Amino acid sequence: MRVAGNACLLSVLAVGLIGCSGSGSKQPEENPNIFPADYKNEILLTMTNTLEDPTNIRDAFVSEPALRQAGKEQRYVVCVRSDSRNANKHYTGSKDRIGYFYAGHLTQLVEASKEQCGSAAYKPFPELEKLCQAKKCI
């Protein structure tokens, strides 16, 4: 009788553990190529946090997000062109940057090569020229 009781208890515990094993509903996978609807604000926030002097930016331009090959994957990318100042308040000259998006959010904004942004269709980006949201702003 005792053996039967132990076997029954083990069976109940096993069923309980199987129920907790995570084989239930799975979280839906995130779509890596959701259109970045808020791309301009994400660029502004990133530039605020990465530029030595995020004030008085001039000649700012941005391209529309476009799906492009990024390594083995396709991702939404934008190109940003601007002339910003260094820590000594001297303009550094116009630079192109490329921004990579994952699931609709900017994950990387780095200097671009001519191959990456040389043929980008830029549009004026006045919001970047008016930028002053950081502790660095004077």
Give the predicted meaning of each segment.
Residues 21-138:
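Cystatin/cathelin-like cysteine-protease inhibitor module
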Residues 1-9:
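Bacterial N-terminal signal peptides that target proteins for export
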